[in-house]
Amino acid sequence: MAILTDENYVDKAERAISLLEKDNKGNYLLTTSQIRKLLSLCSSLYDRSKERKFDELINDVSYLRVQFVYQAGREIAVKDLIEKAQILEALKEIKDRETLQRFCRYMEALVAYFKFYGGKD
């Protein structure tokens, strides 16, 4: 079964954000800048997916996974998000334009719930 579906990706985003690590004051360890950086990596790919065939984007999807791994290696809070949101697993499931665009919407939902639940810089 797919990690992300049209029916579940919003709920999965909310759940992932609710599980993120917080400091002793109840603030997220992840910052808005960190999560928005991940979203920006997806946004340009989403835009290109509207204009190009999926076959032309396969390398970009693979590189996106590399970028997420790199960011996770740099920041423990980003790694926490990537693990709890199952981002790497979801990236591996991208097989066509539809699953790519769903993943990008999932990233938007993660940012939205992060801000909704009080994420700050």
From Swiss-Prot:
It comes from the Bacteria. The keyword RNA-binding applies. Disulfide bonds: none annotated. GO terms for biological process: defense response to virus. InterPro entries: CRISPR-assoc_prot_Csm2_III-A (IPR010149). It holds the Pfam family Csm2_III-A. GO terms for molecular function: RNA binding. Keywords: Antiviral defense, RNA-binding. Belongs to the CRISPR-associated Csm2 family. Encoded in a type III-A CRISPR locus. CRISPR (clustered regularly interspaced short palindromic repeat) is an adaptive immune system that provides protection against mobile genetic elements (viruses, transposable elements and conjugative plasmids). CRISPR clusters contain spacers, sequences complementary to antecedent mobile elements, and target invading nucleic acids. CRISPR clusters are transcribed and processed into CRISPR RNA (crRNA). Part of the Csm effector complex that includes at least Cas10(1), Csm2(3), Csm3(5), Csm4(1), Csm5(1) and mature crRNA. The Csm complex is elongated and slightly twisted with a maximal length of 215 Angstroms and a diameter of 75-80 Angstroms. It has been modeled to have a central protein filamant of Csm3 subunits along which the dsRNA helix of paired crRNA and target RNA binds. The filament is capped at one end by Cas10 and Csm4 and at the other end by Csm5; ssDNA is thought to bind to the N-terminal HD domain of Cas10. This is CRISPR system Cms protein Csm2. It comes from Streptococcus thermophilus. The gene is csm2.
